[in-house]
């Protein structure tokens, strides 16, 4: 993930309200505000940098016998903190 205003996480897909809760809590913890010390673009962009730094931009997974090993209640989510906009992502597979 080459972006500084996006993140990647694993979260449960079972209840869609859970993603709303996650989004609400991220916004509560790191609100968009005009008094960030680094204001290179917009307040939303500045908040996006902080959110991305705290939540992370990469996740490691295990692939076993050609299958992605996720728990039954796990899905991969891309988190957009300064958009929508076009994004790219990269996948790297390496052996043990």
State the predicted function of each range.
Residues 1-96:
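Active-site histidine-anchored catalytic micro-motif
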